[in-house]
Amino acid sequence: MARIAYLGPEGTFTEAALRQITAAGLVPGQGADGVRPTPVDGTPAALDAVRDGAADYACVPIENSIDGSVTPTLDSLAIGSPLQVFAETTLDVAFSIVVKPGLSAADVRTLAAIGVAAAQVRQWVAANLAGAQLRPAYSNADAAQQVAEGRADAAVTSPLAAARWGLDTLADGVVDEPNARTRFVLVGPPAPPPARTGADRTSVVLRIDNAPGALLAALAEFGIRGIDLTRIESRPTRTGLGIYRFFADCVGHIDDEPVAEALKALHRRCADVRYLGSWPTGTPAGALPPSTEEAVRWLAAVRDGKPEPPGESRR
């Protein structure tokens, strides 16, 4: 049975994402009944549990449409022993504002929320709970637990956590931006990636020596091969001012020849390349890598002494 660490306690959006990944059969080698969810106190703790052998996988948020990348996840993937992404899922994120049974909005003096959640409901809170003092929480479920234990009057939380703790809902489906979505990934120790599906994502972390044009040259390895680069982001290495590593996502799989060639070129060009995985996305995240089948056939013919007749077009 696969032990999967996630940001707890029970009732977080991460738990909901884990349920979704499990139901879709995306946990390698496991069915829906072969998973044991293991709540931990934070995203870095979930990834450390995999590194330490306390969990087989971790389910962690990596990107949301409001605030962008989840930097604790990126930083934890970039340092320490290597880890690899095997699956992803996306959740529509809308929050519940909950209180203990019997309380109304007029009774709310303190509001528990994790920082990311508070940022996504700021306008609603300003309009409806303007006088409430914010109490920090380490997860959406922890915010609900604070209300259940009497440490806060209200919480910004998930519907799952509201039900888990038996709280009343002041408002449901609360979010300042109606298209708020969060992407979660399933992370484990390095292993052969899931098979190519034709709708895949590949991710790497690049360390590039500081030289004029070095970053442009590295990114050109994607462009010259017709690979759709969907994300490029820098994060400090924490070793000195102005020293950064770069995260890059592209459409395609390591078994796609253009992607494989780009990765080999990056390995030659960069000071270090950390492969974060190739995994299915369900639907293509952008333009697919160009097919190389015709070029492979042409090269094989040339090697066999059977070149294309003069003037004959490949197209």
UniProtKB/Swiss-Prot annotation:
UniProt keyword Cell membrane present: no
Transmembrane segments: none
Record domain Prephenate dehydratase: where: 3-189
Coiled-coil intervals: none
Gene Ontology process terms (BP): L-phenylalanine biosynthetic process
Assigned GO CC terms: cytoplasm
SUPFAM superfamilies linked: ACT-like, Periplasmic binding protein-like II
Keyword Manganese: no
Keyword annotations from UniProtKB, A to Z: Amino-acid biosynthesis, Aromatic amino acid biosynthesis, Lyase, Phenylalanine biosynthesis
Disulfide bonds: none
Highest taxon listed in the record's lineage: Bacteria
ACT domain: residues covered: 203-280
Pathway where this protein functions: Amino-acid biosynthesis; L-phenylalanine biosynthesis; phenylpyruvate from prephenate: step 1/1
Protein name according to UniProt: Prephenate dehydratase
Gene source species: Mycolicibacterium paratuberculosis (strain ATCC BAA-968 / K-10) (Mycobacterium paratuberculosis)
